[in-house]
């Protein structure tokens, strides 16, 4: 089951059972050695240290069976936070206690788009304030829904929906955004560029580096062009066989330099969907990132 189906199934289940309970959302390591450090000596003094989280969907079966234990293990690996994709039936207040006990922060969530609109928005925002995470990211590739990839007007209407959500988020001190990135064209312009051209600066651009590159997108160009909008970015390696971060095709020095100078990045979020019931791959991810000086 992919993350979109996972979140949608979780959302429908939660809505079916919700009465007085809180709303519940939505929801072989490569032998090649990491490549890093080619331009580290050239980094400017204005670059900042950015905390690293992991997207919990990477180990969602472990999180579903023991969320507190999973958070503790993630903290021991050296991660600074986690990004949620569903709450596994737990009350947000209890999750906040788990986070505090483990020493982790909430880097944000992947939240079903339906929970960011209409009468669900306020409850969604309240839960994020409980968790201490201010980034509410729609985990789908929104440019492709409702045939937006092939329709300029639909793409624009989708952007308008996010502008409304961004305005509603302001009183809560929160931000909404989209996950993924789409390099395919809408009337001659990459869908993601068209979308972010039509949205206000407060709409966050969470690029999934590997996915975006797979659609022909240029993540380096996007971070540079939409300055300050990459408050969060998914660090996922591109290449055959699902390589660990640092052993594929991504120019990580360039990504980090852009994020730390013009991207406005507040969280790096590692994601590796190679094994949902094993800590090995996300442990390898944080090890590689720390070796890169992150």
Question: Over which residues does each language-model region extend?
Answer:
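Histidine-acidic metal/acid-base catalytic patches
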Residues: 4-28, 32-53, 60-71, 75, ...
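Active-site acidic/histidine proton-transfer and metal-coordination neighborhood
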Residues: 11, 16-19, 42-44, 81, ...
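Active-site mouth loops of central-metabolism enzymes
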Residues: 53-65, 110-117, 148-152
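A cross-family glycoside hydrolase active-site/sugar-binding cleft signature
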Residues: 53-57, 83-85, 107-112, 137-139, ...
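Short phosphate-binding/catalytic loops that engage adenosine nucleotides
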Residues: 79, 104, 174, 264, ...
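Active-site-adjacent beta->alpha loops and helix N-cap segments on the catalytic face
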Residues: 89-98
């Amino acid at each position: 089951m992919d993350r979109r189906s996972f979140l949608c199934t979780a959302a429908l289940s939660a809505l079916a059972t919700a009465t007085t309970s809180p709303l519940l959302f939505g929801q072989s390591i490569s032998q090649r050695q990491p490549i890093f450090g080619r331009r580290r000596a050239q980094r400017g003094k204005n670059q900042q240290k950015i905390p690293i989280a992991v997207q919990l969907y990477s180990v969602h079966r472990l999180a579903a069976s023991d969320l507190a234990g999973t958070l503790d293990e993630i903290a021991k690996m050296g991660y600074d936070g986690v990004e949620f994709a569903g709450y596994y039936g737990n009350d947000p207040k209890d999750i906040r206690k788990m986070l505090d006990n483990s020493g982790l922060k909430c880097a944000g969530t992947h939240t079903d788009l339906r929970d960011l609109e209409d009468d669900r928005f306020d409850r969604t925002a309240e839960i994020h304030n409980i968790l201490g995470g201010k980034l509410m990211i729609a985990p789908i590739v929104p440019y492709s829904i409702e045939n937006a990839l092939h329709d300029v007007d639909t793409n624009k209407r989708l952007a308008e929906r996010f502008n409304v959500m961004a305005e509603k988020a302001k009183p809560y001190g929160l931000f909404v955004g989209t996950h993924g990135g789409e390099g395919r064209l809408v009337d001659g312009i990459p869908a993601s560029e068209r979308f972010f051209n039509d949205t206000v600066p407060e709409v966050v651009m969470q690029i999934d580096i590997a996915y975006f590159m797979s659609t022909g997108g240029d993540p380096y160009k996007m971070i540079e062009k939409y300055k300050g909008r990459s408050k969060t970015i998914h660090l996922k390696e591109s290449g055959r066989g699902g390589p660990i971060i640092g052993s594929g095709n991504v120019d990580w020095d360039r990504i980090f330099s852009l994020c730390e100078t013009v991207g406005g990045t507040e969280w790096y979020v590692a994601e590796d969907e190679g094994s949902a019931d094993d800590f090995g791959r996300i442990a390898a991810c944080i090890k590689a990132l720390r070796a890169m000086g992150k």
